[in-house]
Amino acid sequence: MVTGNVTGAASISERPARAMSFLPAGDFVVADLEYTTWPGAMVRGWSDPGEFREIVQIGAVRVAHGDSLCETDALSFLVRPTLNPVLSDYFMALTGITSDDVAEHGTTLESALQDFVAFTDGLPVLTHGGDDRVIVAECARKSLTNPMDETTWQDIRPPFEAYTGRKMMSSDLPAHFGLPDQGRSHDALADSRALLRVLAHLQEAGKLAS
């Protein structure tokens, strides 16, 4: 959820001939989280006093996996942080989410995770950056039972970094592969959809397989 740089778009024809192979055989979910952050927090690993990666937004799309990849359902909701209920100016500028937004429209982390696991309905969940580890840490920190303990998670950032030779955020990937920008970056649902567009593009081009 932190900013990254794109140094130029690359067409499919410019990528290596090999195909990535990580798609689940059946339907799956693509998900993204937005969590509290401050200037420099990522570099120092959220290690300053009072810095915690508290979930503020969950976004996800359910994907039908056939000859093409198609979105069949979506969710997006805000979560009220409790350790840092007042969001940093940095976070608000990055995401467009304000403290008033989460105070008025946010739900509890426990409720959000219950709704999220119901949405996934046993399907594997793909993330770009290991967001499951954020959920595990949040539940441990707040003494909550993790309802997604049995969920199959797959972090697809490593194969993308190996394929492109670059470290990028999920919101940067469409531009890298020459796809038009659609939606605000650092919005959990928009970033989930951005990642799905890239997956669908690569599958259609024969560069991505199960």
Name these PLM-found stretches.
Residues 4-16, 132-135, 166-171:
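Short, motif-level signal for alpha-helix interfacial/capping segments enriched in acidic residues
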Residues 1-23, 176, 196-210:
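Acidic two-metal-ion nuclease catalytic site recognized across multiple nuclease folds
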Residues 13-29, 33-133, 148, 175-180:
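Conserved non-catalytic scaffold segment of RNase H-like nuclease domains
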Residues 35-37, 158, 194:
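Short, glycine/acidic-enriched loop or turn micro-motifs at the edges of active sites
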Residues 141-150:
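A short alpha->loop->secondary-structure connector
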Residues 153-168:
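Short alpha-helix plus adjacent loop in nuclease-associated cores
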